[in-house]
């Protein structure tokens, strides 16, 4: 008896402690600060609510049936030969089928509406940022501003941001949870992502795909400035850096594997550096093709400069 009371008290204490600990958690996906993130949250909550139409009655019936047909209830109807009911069959099949159809239509429409490579309709001109995933850091190039950074980006709030993403190493995943979709980064290929921040703030960016021992520290900050003037000040600060990225030798030096990297700024960047990073893998592929049959060589060569705009992404 004492053991039962002890276990019961321990159970309530664990439940209370878990509730307190979970109250300190902050789900970025359910607290978005960008238009894409808001629409994705709406989709998640809608799908969750529809599934509860099935889940809640199932839980209630499981508890209700167990209570009604308990051994001590002598008034419960005993029907050992019962095997079929048209009414029950109609409900348990019709409701889930209708929900699945609705979810299918909803998912189809929102998947196409939130296609990552689709430019956002907005009056402001997008800020273009070229993203290169490295071991284990993020390298960002601003081709229009002529600067580059490591593990930090900035852009004005309420202004679309156009990300061009590739990898200098293994496959990775570029993700700013509070702003919206993640997109894969793949060597020798370019993926595209369009996001926007609805309000100023500093948002966490992460690698959403395991990529080696430094994966856990592969994080960056995305700063949505209050206005264009604040963004220009950030660009001016980067231009004051003594660091430059003037050739591929400097790039390869930066790309050497390292963990938990600090923010760095580069005041000057080699023109078309992003394209050079992609092309160096394509050139390697072409040299490998020299030993392959002509038909295979042609097939691989046709993939040069591939734009994987429809690569899988989290919507």
Curated annotation (Swiss-Prot):
SUPFAM superfamilies: Cupredoxins (SSF49503), Cytochrome c oxidase subunit II-like, transmembrane region (SSF81464). One of its GO terms (molecular function) is copper ion binding. GO terms for cellular component: cytochrome o ubiquinol oxidase complex; plasma membrane. Residues 69-92 are cytoplasmic. Disruption phenotype: Increased reduction of the ubiquinone pool (in aerobically grown minimal medium with glucose). Gene3D superfamilies: 1.10.287.90, Cupredoxins - blue copper proteins. The keyword Membrane applies. Competitively inhibited by piericidin A, non-competitively inhibited by 2-n-heptyl-4-hydroxyquinoline N-oxide, NaN(3) and KCN; 50% inhibition occurs at 2 uM, 2 uM, 15 mM and 10 uM, respectively. Inhibited by Zn(2+) and Cd(2+). A lipid is attached at residue 25 (S-diacylglycerol cysteine). PROSITE patterns: COX2_CUA, COX2_TM, PROKAR_LIPOPROTEIN. It comes from the Bacteria. Residues 25-50, 112-315 are periplasmic. Its main location: membrane. The chain crosses the membrane at residues 51-68, 93-111. Keywords: Cell inner membrane, Cell membrane, Electron transport, Lipoprotein, Membrane, Oxidoreductase, Palmitate, Respiratory chain, Signal, Transmembrane, Transmembrane helix, Transport. Residues 288-315 are annotated as: Disordered. Residues 294-315 have a biased composition (Basic and acidic residues). It holds the Pfam family COX_ARM. Heterooctamer of two A chains, two B chains, two C chains and two D chains. Belongs to the cytochrome c oxidase subunit 2 family. PANTHER family: CYTOCHROME BO(3) UBIQUINOL OXIDASE SUBUNIT 2 (PTHR22888:SF18), CYTOCHROME C OXIDASE, SUBUNIT II (PTHR22888). This is Cytochrome bo(3) ubiquinol oxidase subunit 2. It comes from Escherichia coli (strain K12). The gene is cyoA.
């Amino acid at each position: 008896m004492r053991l039962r009371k002890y276990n019961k008290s321990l159970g309530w204490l664990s439940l209370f402690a878990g509730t307190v600990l979970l109250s300190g958690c902050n789900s970025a996906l359910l607290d978005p600060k960008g238009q894409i993130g808001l629409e994705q949250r709406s989709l998640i909550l809608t799908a969750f609510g529809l599934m509860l139409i099935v889940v809640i009655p199932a839980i209630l019936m499981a508890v209700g049936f167990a209570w009604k047909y308990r051994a001590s209830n002598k008034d419960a109807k005993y029907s050992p030969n019962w095997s079929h009911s048209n009414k029950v069959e109609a409900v348990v099949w019709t409701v889930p089928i209708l929900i699945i159809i609705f979810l299918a239509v909803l998912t189809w429409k929102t998947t196409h509406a939130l296609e990552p490579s689709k430019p956002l309709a907005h009056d402001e001109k997008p800020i273009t940022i070229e993203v290169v995933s490295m071991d284990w850091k993020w390298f960002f190039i601003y081709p229009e501003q002529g600067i580059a950074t490591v593990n930090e980006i900035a852009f004005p709030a309420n202004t679309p941001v156009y990300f061009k993403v590739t990898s200098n190493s293994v496959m990775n995943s570029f993700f700013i949870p509070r702003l919206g979709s993640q997109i894969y980064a793949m060597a020798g290929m370019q993926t595209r992502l369009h996001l926007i921040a609805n309000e100023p703030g500093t948002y966490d960016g992460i690698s959403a795909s395991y990529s080696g021992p430094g994966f856990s520290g592969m994080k960056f900050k995305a700063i949505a400035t209050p206005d264009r003037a604040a963004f220009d000040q950030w660009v001016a600060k980067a231009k004051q850096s003594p660091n430059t990225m003037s050739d591929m030798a400097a790039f390869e030096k930066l790309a050497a594997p390292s963990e938990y990297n600090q923010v760095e700024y580069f005041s000057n960047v080699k023109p078309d550096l992003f394209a050079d990073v992609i092309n160096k893998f394509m050139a390697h592929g072409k040299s490998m093709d020299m030993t392959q049959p002509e038909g295979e060589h042609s097939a691989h060569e046709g993939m040069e400069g591939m734009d994987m705009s429809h690569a899988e992404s989290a919507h």
